[in-house]
Amino acid sequence: MNRLPDDYDPYAVEEPSDEEPALSSSEDEVDVLLHGTPDQKRKLIRECLTGESESSSEDEFEKEMEAELNSTMKTMEDKLSSLGTGSSSGNGKVATAPTRYYDDIYFDSDSEDEDRAVQVTKKKKKKQHKIPTNDELLYDPEKDNRDQAWVDAQRRGYHGLGPQRSRQQQPVPNSDAVLNCPACMTTLCLDCQRHESYKTQYRAMFVMNCSINKEEVLRYKASENRKKRRVHKKMRSNREDAAEKAETDVEEIYHPVMCTECSTEVAVYDKDEVFHFFNVLASHS
């Protein structure tokens, strides 16, 4: 009986595996075609027909896909750019204000050195300075002038100055103050006269944003305000003294005046249609 050698290993298998077949000989290729997996057969057929491995073919495929993607993106960008220029200049549906620029005189300099530099670069294209819009400035420079013109027109209308006269013949009437509501700052009067004795009181005939409460009546005795007339009583006759005494007993009637925005009482209204303001904020002009 033959004896096995000492270095014999019954588990050693020297055959090539199915996953990584040795494709160096024709027998291995036949074995792959007969017993290999579909992936192994596909790789073998591709290599035999094209002479290229799987990795090289995949690189070529990726290059083709990338080139196709680039061409597609370029085509789409060209279409978008053509649509943008066509909509802005062709149909003109979206109307935009024309861009305004400053005059060159605003940027002229009196310096001789700068004038020489300007002469050197005179042939170059002049740089235009764009005038920013009110939206870009977040400010309207002409708003104050328009508001002042409106106030002046209101004051002229109060005094019967018509628009047919020129501005030189229409001086703006003087006003002691512009009256505002102390609670909500609403403008109440643009043309008023200040009281001679009480500096915080004003009277006016033309008001705005004011409502008169005719249902409520305020009574005030006039005799207290006419004490100074008693100095001249000795110079008058008895008939005049009796008439004055009857007049002093008459009460003056007023109606309260409220702000239309917040209903704050700001003035009183007398029988002569004159407003007497006592609870206001005055902007002295």
Curated annotation (Swiss-Prot):
Ranges annotated as biased composition (Low complexity): 81-92
Record-level GO BP terms: negative regulation of transcription elongation by RNA polymerase II; positive regulation of cell population proliferation; positive regulation of transcription elongation by RNA polymerase II
- InterPro entries, per database record: E2F-assoc_phosphoprotein
Cellular compartment(s): Cytoplasm; Nucleus
Q: Where is this region: Disordered?
A: 1-30, 48-96, 118-144
| N-acetylmethionine sites (modified residues) | M1
Q: Does the keyword Acetylation apply?
A: yes
**Phosphoserine modification, residue list:** S17, S109, S111
Query: For this UniProt entry, which segments traverse the membrane?
Result: none
Q: Which UniProt keywords apply?
A: Acetylation, Cytoplasm, Nucleus, Phosphoprotein
Biased composition regions of type Acidic residues, renumbered to the chain: 15-30, 55-67
Composition bias, Basic residues: 121-130
Q: What is its main location?
A: cytoplasm
Q: Which residues carry this modification: Phosphothreonine?
A: T37
**One GO cellular component term:** nucleus
Q: In which tissues is it expressed?
A: Ubiquitously expressed. Highest levels in heart, placenta, skeletal muscle and pancreas. Lower levels in brain, lung and kidney. In the brain, expressed in all regions with high levels in the cerebellum and cerebral cortex. Expressed in COS1 and transformed skin fibroblasts.
Query: Acetylation as a keyword?
Result: yes
Q: What does this protein do?
A: May play an important role in the fine-tuning of both major E2F1 activities, the regulation of the cell-cycle and the induction of apoptosis. Promotes S-phase entry, and inhibits p14(ARP) expression.
SUBUNIT field = Interacts with E2F1. The C-terminal half binds the N-terminal of E2F1. Also interacts with E2F2 and E2F3, but not E2F4.
Which protein are we looking at?
E2F-associated phosphoprotein
- Organism, by scientific name, is Homo sapiens
Q: Which gene encodes it?
A: EAPP
